[in-house]
């Protein structure tokens, strides 16, 4: 069980009021709030250990390096990687996916090869593959969705085949919250000799992820969605794949030896981390992982699903509300995307903000999915470890007020 009030006390931002109303932050799929433990880890680094890593023998450099590499170890343990060297620090999910595209895919995709994604994908896991396919003359194929917006193993089997070289899918949809059967789809991909990349931006913060059990070849995620600062994320890759890949950025830190006309690279993971890394961000990510591990991801997932189930139940009672995705909360993570007939999503979000309720409105960086849903935009409420049933009640009251405001 989660002690919500104890957890909420760890998040300074939640104590404030917006428009003289208590802040109800329901925009966690966009970014998460930060507990004081993470903020303190970041400030401690800058107050006491600020130095560059791997490049000095003085005490500050040694402490900074130890903290930075310790964070890498925490990431590896958190997602159950085989070894620490398989964890590459990146700026976030987007840069992690682009690293795979620009290095692995650029070297291995040829004209006529097929890349399989889905209509669920965030633009960050669509545009890089789209542009690669255009450059290479490859074929981009989409797994059809079921009526409730889920990806089924059956549809994956129909799409993945002999010409498939890469499968790239979101573990959890940032719009519908649907959970992809990634382990089964990875097995299908591997039957045809394809590699699978998983966009885990919406999964790692909210549920247990075991990259070895999934048999993912690559797994990308961001820190800011799991209570760490912006600008830090990670890419997991199987060692044999990463070893064979060439760096895509060059400069200090990633080199082994430099001559006038040639250079050699460091071993994993550092050959992919050119320049001064995001040291403070990585250390803070480690602190966020400590926090999540202490609460327990199983507890977090159950809490969020309970909130989603309650939100769906209460929203369904409001005439004119359309909820997208499966109504069964066990098939999704803790977010609900919806529309109110007669009210634009941006108007809904604006009215809710007057009551201190923060949600997201727009296409959520998923325009192909919006087209599949038959809409241009939606409203989205997304939950996390610190959200409460009372905040869902406030959301429901705000939606009823929106109906009154527009005379619906």
Question: How should these model regions be labeled?
Answer:
Residues 1-408:
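Pyridoxal 5′-phosphate
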């Amino acid at each position: 069980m989660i002690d919500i009030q104890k957890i909420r006390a760890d998040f300074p931002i939640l104590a404030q009021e917006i428009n003289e109303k208590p802040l109800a932050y329901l925009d966690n799929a966009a970014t998460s709030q930060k507990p004081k433990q993470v903020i303190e880890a970041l400030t401690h680094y800058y107050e006491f250990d600020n130095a560059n890593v791997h490049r000095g023998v003085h005490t500050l450099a040694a402490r900074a390096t130890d903290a930075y590499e310790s964070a890498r170890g925490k990431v590896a343990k958190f997602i159950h990687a085989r070894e620490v060297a398989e964890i590459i620090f990146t700026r976030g999910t987007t840069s992690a996916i682009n690293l795979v595209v620009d290095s692995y895919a650029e070297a291995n995709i040829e004209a006529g090869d097929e890349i399989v994604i889905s209509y669920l994908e965030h633009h960050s896991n669509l545009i890089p593959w789209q542009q690669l396919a255009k450059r290479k003359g490859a074929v981009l194929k989409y797994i059809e969705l079921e009526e409730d917006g889920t990806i089924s193993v059956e549809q994956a089997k129909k799409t993945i085949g002999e010409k498939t070289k890469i499968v790239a899918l979101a573990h959890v949809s940032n719009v519908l919250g649907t959970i992809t059967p990634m382990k089964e789809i990875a097995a299908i991909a591997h039957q045809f000799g394809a590699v699978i990349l998983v966009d885990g931006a919406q999964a790692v913060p909210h549920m247990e992820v075991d990259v070895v059990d999934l048999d993912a070849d690559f797994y990308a995620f961001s820190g800011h969605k799991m209570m760490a600062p912006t600008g830090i994320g990670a890419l997991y890759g199987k060692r044999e794949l990463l070893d064979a890949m060439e760096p895509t950025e060059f400069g200090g830190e990633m080199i082994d030896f430099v001559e006038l006309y040639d250079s050699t690279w460091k071993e994993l993971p550092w050959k992919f981390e050119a320049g001064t890394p995001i040291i403070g961000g990585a250390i803070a990510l480690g602190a966020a992982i400590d926090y999540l591990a202490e609460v327990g991801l199983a507890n977090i997932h159950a809490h969020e699903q309970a909130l989603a189930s309650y939100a769906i139940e209460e929203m369904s009672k409001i005439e004119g509300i359309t909820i997208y995705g499966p109504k069964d909360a066990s098939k999704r993570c803790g977010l609900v995307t919806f529309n109110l007939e007669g009210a634009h999503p941006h108007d809904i979000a604006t009215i809710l903000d007057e009551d201190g309720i923060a949600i997201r409105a727009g296409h959520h960086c998923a325009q192909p999915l919006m087209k599949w849903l038959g809409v241009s935009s939606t409203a989205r409420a997304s939950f996390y470890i610190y959200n409460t049933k009372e905040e869902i009640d406030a959301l429901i009251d705000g939606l009823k007020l929106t109906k009154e405001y527009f005379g619906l």
